[in-house]
Amino acid sequence: MLRIVSHLAEAQAELERICDRTHDDAVVHREASVREIVQAVQRRGDAALIEFTQEFDGFALQAENLRVSGAELDAAYQQIPKELLDAIRLAHHQIEAFHRQRVPKSWVQFGADGEVLGKRYTPVDRAGLYVPGGRAAYPSTVLMNAVPAKVAGVERVVITTPPGPDGSLNPAVLVAAQEAGIEEIYRVGGAQAIAALAYGTATIPKVDVISGPGNIYVTLAKKLVYGTVGIDSLAGPSEVLIIADRSANPRWVAADLLAQAEHDPLAAAILITPDLELATQVGFEVERQLQDHPRRLVTEKAIAHYGLAIVVDSLETAVKLSNQFAPEHLELEVEDPWALVEQVRHAGAIFLGSLTPEAIGDYVAGPNHTLPTSGAARYASALSVETFLKSSSLIEYTAASLQRVARAVDVLATAEGLESHAESVRLRQQSLDR
């Protein structure tokens, strides 16, 4: 089932096809539908949320139960096993420890004539986190979005997540939110939740930044509201690219490919190796492990359409292909991964060595698992504390420093036809010359 390609031109064409897998005519149609939803929420607020939640989630939402109650939050702790609570707490600790090390510090520097230049970082006032529902519950998504926002110092962080047909929310999601210090949670999902966060309703506050993954409707809604609010990214389906040599364990490689494919029918799982025998063995292992897979239909579809093994002449060629694809997750299951990593230019996250499956990064390693997809790793990075911060330049000039640059400002402003710019400096210089 895992197709093997050994011609370079064909491999490049396949990687391009996989990278563009969400760019189809259906997206254009969906964008029109999403625009209608967003505009309805902007106009009608809570009433539109109630209507769309009934239509899409099958739950008769009321304005008074949009927000999750304190009783529900308390009860969630009784609804999950202790082992899961312990795992959530371990993940929270690891993620927080990593992100605290990544907080940029404000700074100033002093020039020769006493001028002061610097940069000051401040958090946004409000952040809205989207946590998907649907096929699975994602407490890890809560932590990966909530922890950077809290570490950044955002004063008000709220969560939206879609309810089940009975209005319930997954207790693990509610527990993860509370462990991260968030108790303001709203039971609404989809494009309508993004619109509510962007424009505000009588119940849900307007925020400054929206983060969190979702389906195509959520992604399109984030695209539409960008500019009204900041967003983390426009995430596409998940993907892993594994570079492996003959030292790799084919069972482990197959398991890592399937771990990505089980996310979504559009997920991509790619192996690049200079070893044809390894590629063949991995293909056999993929089929064997699929037989009893609990998410076989989803996983099988992803492997059939976006699973691929590419056989190349060298590891150097493998890295070149990877850089062209710019994967969300890159695993280096090779004998000396640190020797190879220096050649990697574009990847959302890099997992070095056979004992570092991508799942470690999904849950407990600490670095963020919200990563650029669909080739965006060429220019974008993981969600971080900086997603919830903005910087302001600090500039203070003295008499001496103003005198030193005044003529240059005058000349440049005059050349651009901005006379008042030039005059604003001339007046000060004249005052200093008296």
From Swiss-Prot:
Cofactor needs: Zn(2+)
Catalytic activity entry: L-histidinol + 2 NAD(+) + H2O = L-histidine + 2 NADH + 3 H(+)
Pfam families linked: Histidinol_dh
Entry's cofactor comment: Binds 1 zinc ion per subunit.
Keywords recorded for this protein, A-Z: Amino-acid biosynthesis, Histidine biosynthesis, Metal-binding, NAD, Oxidoreductase, Zinc
Keyword NAD: yes
UniProt entry tagged with the keyword Ribosomal protein: no
GO molecular function, one term: NAD binding
Positions of transmembrane segments: none
Descriptive protein name: Histidinol dehydrogenase
